[in-house]
Curated annotation (Swiss-Prot):
Its cofactor is FAD. This is Flavin-dependent monooxygenase. Its EC number is 1.14.13.-. The lineage of its organism: Bacteria, environmental samples. An FAD-requiring monooxygenase active on tetracycline antibiotic and some of its derivatives, which leads to their inactivation. Expression in E.coli confers high resistance to oxytetracycline, slightly less resistance to tetracycline, moderate resistance to minocycline but no resistance to tigecycline. Degrades tetracycline and oxytetracycline; the reaction requires NADPH. Degrades and confers resistance to chlortetracycline. Gene3D superfamilies: D-Amino Acid Oxidase, subunit A, domain 2 (3.30.9.10), FAD/NAD(P)-binding domain (3.50.50.60). Belongs to the aromatic-ring hydroxylase family. It comes from Unknown prokaryotic organism.
Length: 385
């Protein structure tokens, strides 16, 4: 495929910058746009696992990722009264094996953005409309600007606006796994030292984690609920929903809820998967969570984003045209996506226990997780491009 192709990439999180790196590497002309005024800093910890580690090494970022990795030394399980039940040390609590690594989301975004400093990147650029033609796509931005591109690739996340513009409701389905997640920063008032402490009971999980910055910690909530619509988008309702589910739940729950309004990085979402037969239509493609999020519970969203970006760019490099490249992208990535989405469903059904786990029960569950995860994280053989 001619490498002079002008390609618009939408979304400056994980998949978007990774895709731009590979497109630029292969001689294409990518432009990256992001609707927000900057990349999001900080955030929760994410993982590079399985073959995604190989992609990171090929990109030359693996050493940088390792240098910025989290450094949790233990995970402590407590009961509702705050009594220590047991603790795990090293990588065991994070389900990482071999050269797999955990890093804060914002740190990985910074590393990826540093690989594409020579690529045009525009912030505060939201898309108003996309119009496909035989030989190009016309993009109307909300700031009034209009541009034509040979291809458009959207990496704008689970709630992708591009997906809603381009694909009909018959083309995709958001599968709610019946769980919800929330994360926000708090002062490290428990003075945790490279440690995560958590309470898992009544199909709910509350955690406090402090890693590199000893003054700061992150509060985490995960829970099952059938009493909410799939889509709660306003922050006030999200916080009310958390209070309904965690007030007087035990341990530090009430304290964390009281600190919630002071956080400037509050995050909440339903745990969902994007289910699609194909991630392409005409001259437009989806990559990462926009097309195939496996759910945060799987811990594989970042890995799917990196692998998906690698394969999509590689197929565009080797194919005769975008039609052939998109067809191969859909075909090659499908088994990997399906394996990791199945893993995400299994986790949603197997975690968030009714009663606090014993050390033996946690050990048994961890071993099962590691076995299933190893298969899912290697459910594709990386092509060489």
């Amino acid at each position: 495929m001619p490498h002079t192709k002008k390609i618009l990439v939408i979304g400056a999180s994980i998949a978007g910058p990774a895709l731009c790196y590979w497109l630029n590497h292969y001689g294409f002309q990518p432009t990256l746009v992001e609707k927000n005024q900057s990349t999001r800093k900080g955030g929760y910890a994410i993982d590079l696992r399985g073959i995604a580690v190989d992609v990171a090494k090929q990109m030359g970022i693996y050493d940088s990722v390792c240098a910025m990795r989290t450094s949790l030394q233990c995970v402590r399980y407590v009961d509702a009264a705050g009594n220590l039940l047991f603790e795990e040390h090293g990588e065991k609590g994070g389900f990482r094996q071999g050269d797999e690594v955990e890093i804060v989301r914002g740190d990985l975004v910074d590393i990826l953005m540093k690989t594409i400093t020579d690529i045009p990147c525009f912030y505060d650029h939201a898309i108003e409309s996309l119009t496909q033609h035989d030989d190009h796509v016309t993009v109307q931005f909300k700031n009034g600007k209009t541009e034509n591109y040979d291809l458009v690739i959207a990496a704008d996340g689970l709630h992708s606006a591009t997906r809603r513009m381009v694909f009909s409701k018959d083309d995709y389905h958001l599968r709610n796994l019946g769980c919800y997640i929330s994360v926000f920063s708090i002062p490290n008032y428990l003075q945790l030292d490279h440690c995560e402490t958590l309470l898992e009971a009544k199909q709910k999980l509350v955690s406090i984690t402090s890693d590199k910055d000893s003054t700061k910690a992150f509060a985490g909530f995960m829970f099952r609920s059938s009493n909410s619509p799939n889509y709660i988008r306003d922050e006030a309702s999200q916080k009310d929903f958390l209070r309904e589910n965690f007030t007087n739940h035990g341990w530090e729950s009430n304290k964390l809820l009281s600190l919630m309004n002071d956080a400037n990085d509050f995050y909440f979402d339903a745990i969902m998967q994007v289910k699609m037969k194909d991630w392409t239509k005409g001259r437009i493609a989806l990559v990462g969570d926009a097309g195939y999020t496996p759910s945060p519970l799987s811990g594989q969203g970042t890995s799917l984003a990196l692998v998906g970006a690698y394969i999509l760019a590689g197929e565009l490099k080797t194919a005769t045209d975008h039609v052939a490249a998109f067809a191969r992208y859909n075909e090659l990535l499908k088994p990997y996506v399906e394996a990791n989405q199945a893993f995400g469903v299994w986790v949603s059904e197997s975690f968030l226990a009714d009663e606090p786990l014993s050390a033996e029960q946690a050990e048994e569950r961890n071993n099962i997780v590691l076995g299933i995860m190893k298969k899912a994280t290697h459910a594709i053989e990386l092509p060489e491009y």
